[in-house]
Design a protein with these regions (language model features):
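Signature of the 12-TM Major Facilitator Superfamily
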Residues: 33-37, 90-94, 116-119, 173-177, ...
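Selected transmembrane alpha-helices and immediately adjacent juxtamembrane segments
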Residues: 143-173
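Membrane-interface helix-loop-helix junctions at boundaries between adjacent transmembrane segments
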Residues: 79-117
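Membrane-interface interhelical linkers
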Residues: 1-13, 17, 21-67, 76-86, ...
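Hydrophobic transmembrane alpha-helices of multi-pass small-molecule transport proteins
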Residues: 101-105, 114-134, 259-278
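Structural signature of hydrophobic alpha-helical transmembrane segments
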Residues: 1-15, 54-72, 111-127, 150, ...
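Alpha-helical transmembrane segments of compact multi-pass small-molecule transporters, enriched
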Residues: 40-46, 94-108, 181-185, 217-220, ...
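Hydrophobic residues within membrane-embedded alpha-helical segments of Major Facilitator Superfamily
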Residues: 7, 14, 21, 41, ...
Length: 278
């Protein structure tokens, strides 16, 4: 059995944890400042990944890594903007589904075919994303929220697709470039907006934790893409939304709605099917 699903699931768990701590930090700190803090920490620590995984620097993989980093941060900024001006229940499901769908479409275009078990797992995984990320209520424009969710999901999907184009021998080198390019974009945004550069107090602590987990997650995600098809890996790793919901229920005492519970169960089955068929 391929190690790709294993790395993808580890990435999903770590991304969910990173998202959870970023949300904690955002209680006292602007979301872009939290993101900048987390990415800065990940950039500082990213060279350590070269000690763990044998890596090779190439111009092609470095360019792909930089483009993936820019796309990922663009997706985050569009997502946060969507959360600010529209109901989360509109923005999140659309972004989550497209995040997973874009790499699947790319696989189809390139003639990559999956077995029936993996295909069912991927379809169920997309359903699970909608169930776990949907929350009712909220204020703002549903139309604008849908547009921002759509653009955010496409940006994330492009980032994931680009990560799938990195050569296996590159190891963690593209991850370092990806994180660095993302930080450069965030610094450019800071020069324009002049919001707080780095989080302070509790926001700094939680933001730093989000950065550590985020870097580790992206490293595992890159290894997953280097070992498997983009579609199954993207669907399995995108289940981090489920992890974030479970952590919020366990530690923030948030209520899990019945459809979210169904989504959690669907996630478990979907990941199992993808792993069995890979």
């Amino acid at each position: 059995m391929s190690l790709a699903p294993t790395f993808a699931v580890i990435a999903a768990v770590l991304l969910g944890g990173s998202d959870f701590f970023a949300a904690r930090s955002a209680r006292s700190t602007p979301s872009l400042t939290v993101t900048r803090t987390a990415v800065a920490v990940s950039v500082l620590l990213s060279p350590l990944s070269l000690l763990v995984v044998e890596s090779k620097w190439t111009a092609r993989d470095s360019v792909i890594g930089a483009l993936a980093g820019i796309a990922m941060i663009t997706g985050l900024m569009l997502l946060y903007r969507g959360y600010k001006v529209a109901p989360m229940g509109v923005v999140a499901p659309i972004a989550s589904v497209l995040l997973a769908a874009v790499p699947v479409v790319w696989d189809v275009i390139n003639g990559v075919r999956t077995g029936p078990t993996v295909a069912v797992g991927m379809a169920l995984g997309v359903v699970a994303l909608v169930l776990t990320s949907y929350t009712p209520g909220g204020e703002g424009s549903a139309t604008l929220g849908a547009a921002l969710g759509l653009s955010s999901g496409i940006a994330f999907g492009v980032a994931f697709t680009l990560m799938g184009e990195v050569s296996k021998g590159a190891g963690m080198a593209p991850v370092i470039v990806q994180r660095s390019a993302g930080l450069v974009l965030l610094l450019v945004v800071w020069l324009v907006r002049r919001d707080p550069l780095i989080a302070t107090g509790p926001g700094l602590r939680y933001g730093a934790l989000a950065g550590v987990l985020g870097l580790t997650a992206i490293g595992h995600l890159q290894m997953a893409f280097q070992r498997g098809a983009s579609g199954p890996v993207s669907v399995a790793s995108s289940q981090f939304a489920t992890v974030a919901v479970v952590l919020a229920v366990l530690f923030n005492k948030e209520r899990m709605r019945w459809w979210q519970a169904m989504g959690v169960a669907a996630t478990a089955v979907a990941v199992a099917l993808i792993a069995l068929g890979s």
